[in-house]
Amino acid sequence: MNKEHEHGGAFRASAEKRERNSRTEYAKKLKTKQIYDWLPLQLEMAHHWIEHEKTQTKRNMARGAVHFCQFGENIGCEQNEERPVVIISNNTVNSTSGNVLVIPLTKNLKIRTFPKTGQPILTKEGNPIPRFQSHYFLFKNKYDFLAFDSAAKTEETTSVSKIRLKDHLGSLDEEDISRLETRLKWSFGL
């Protein structure tokens, strides 16, 4: 290998490293700004909780209900911002605790496809099948309160304060709650 070729490769590697570092620094600055932008709302919600703890704890939340939830700004792949969630904790917990267990919804459906053609694999009803066993699809044509076809991401199940929950959008039927339970059991290894 000649010297010029060696130096060209080293130069390219160095340029790629500078580019990665530049993207990393930009991502850090952006995340810092997003967290600082979220802080005033987070403080407002925390103060509201302190002032209204008893009424928040007694808020009537039902298993299978879909609400908007303000997740704020978080780290890594954790859910961020305001998004719909399904309340999955049992109604005893829901009526006595200041927190509830929720499954976040996303409009980004990851669909199972045939390996050779890339075409979606569909149910007998013509609906796409989730790529991941931990996801369960909820369709707008069944739940018109949803703005989009949505995936319930059971691997992202988390406990949130009721103060984070906003508008009640609607509720899932028992069949879909049961199917969500199956995915939850798989996600938690139960």
Task: Give a label for each model feature.
Residues 1-190:
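Conserved functional hotspots at enzyme active or ligand-binding sites that engage polyanionic ligands
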